[in-house]
Amino acid sequence: MMDWKEAEELACKFLKKKGYKILERNYRTKYGEIDIVARDGREIVFVEVKSGSGKVDPLERIDLKKVRNLEQTARFYMIQNKLKGPARVDFVRVTPEGIDHFEGIWLG
């Protein structure tokens, strides 16, 4: 079974291959943590990485509270770094079968 560090490393490599620029990893605030902050063209992308194997889909561990915390942390990052313009939250699922990228997940 892969640990979270391995999963994040694989996710970073995957995103770089897609042309993303990794800006920061494991960004923390009082609101929560964002695994990867990246740039996709003009857009800032906040990426939550989930890994796992077995019968439970890693994405099932993401609930509304987690999404709200991601949104707050993303907004804080934008303000703290004086960034304007488009931004989004993505999820990357890393399993032994491969990597799936879900773009533009905003639930609020």
Curated annotation (Swiss-Prot):
It comes from Thermotoga maritima (strain ATCC 43589 / DSM 3109 / JCM 10099 / NBRC 100826 / MSB8). Coiled coil: none annotated. One of its GO terms (molecular function) is nucleic acid binding. It holds the Pfam family UPF0102. It comes from the Bacteria. CDD domains: PoNe_Nuclease (cd20736). InterPro entries: Restrct_endonuc-II-like, tRNA_endonuc-like_dom_sf, UPF0102_YraN-like. The lineage of its organism: Bacteria, Thermotogati, Thermotogota, Thermotogae, Thermotogales. Belongs to the UPF0102 family. This is UPF0102 protein TM_0253.
